[in-house]
């Protein structure tokens, strides 16, 4: 099962070092999500990361940076719903309903489905799906290896996410809300499952 980590919405001091540390400890593919950040701000952040990791990063904003920095790809969402003209690389997308998954899954490398559980990082962002609904979606072939679970994912949820047939889990609050000394040990524990 894939583990994807999304950055926090705002830049923070030491973030480049934290993301680099995640890479060094086995993070395969982070998603750079900075709503409202300028291309310059995002470019400055990317320049703080070792160049060897650029081909593993997916950006949610400022899609032109994908070619400038040789990033893995782009992630479509409500703010940026269209693939740029001429773009041929990796594409993922946020989906907030099973209908959206059906509509977009075949056009993407994978999609995020959310919120699976009550969000850790977004107050009032509650689970949208019952376990029964998710099981039926799996049986119908809607949830499969191209669908990543997002929203309130914690260590305790990973076995259920796997049993429901998701291809992976997308983490945000559970990773970034860890104390500095627990940050990497927690990520390594998540990776073991």
Where are these regions (language model features)?
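Active-site mouth loops of central-metabolism enzymes
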Residues: 1-16, 92-94, 147-149
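Glycine-rich phosphate-binding active-site loops on the catalytic face of alpha/beta enzymes
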Residues: 5, 76-85, 112-125, 155-193
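Active-site beta-loop-alpha junctions enriched in small/polar residues
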Residues: 6-10, 35, 62, 79, ...
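Conserved strand-to-helix beginnings and helix N-cap segments that scaffold or border functional pockets
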Residues: 16-17, 42-43, 180-184
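Catalytic cores of alpha/beta
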Residues: 18, 57-72, 76, 96-107, ...
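N-terminal active-site wall of soluble small-molecule enzyme domains
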Residues: 21-23, 27-87
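Charged helix-capping and loop-helix junction motifs
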Residues: 44-46, 126-135
């Amino acid at each position: 099962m894939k583990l994807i980590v999304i950055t926090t919405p705002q830049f923070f001091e030491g973030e480049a070092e934290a993301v680099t540390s995640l890479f060094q400890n086995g993070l395969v593919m982070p998603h750079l999500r900075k709503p409202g950040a300028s291309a310059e701000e995002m470019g400055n952040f990317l320049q703080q990361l070792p160049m060897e990791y650029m081909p593993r990063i997916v950006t949610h904003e400022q899609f032109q940076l994908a070619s400038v920095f040789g990033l893995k790809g782009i992630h479509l969402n409500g703010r940026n719903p269209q693939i740029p003209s001429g773009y041929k690389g990796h594409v993922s997308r946020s989906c907030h309903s099973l209908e959206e998954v059906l509509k977009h899954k075949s056009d993407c490398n994978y999609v995020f489905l959310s919120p699976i559980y009550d969000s850790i990082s977004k107050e009032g962002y509650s689970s949208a799906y019952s376990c029964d609904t998710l099981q039926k979606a799996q049986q119908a072939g809607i949830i499969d290896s191209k669908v990543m679970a997002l929203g309130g994912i914690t260590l305790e949820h990973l076995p259920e996410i796997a049993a429901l047939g998701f291809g992976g889990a997308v983490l945000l609050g559970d990773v970034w809300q860890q104390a500095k000394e627990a940050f990497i040990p927690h990520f390594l524990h998540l990776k073991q499952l």
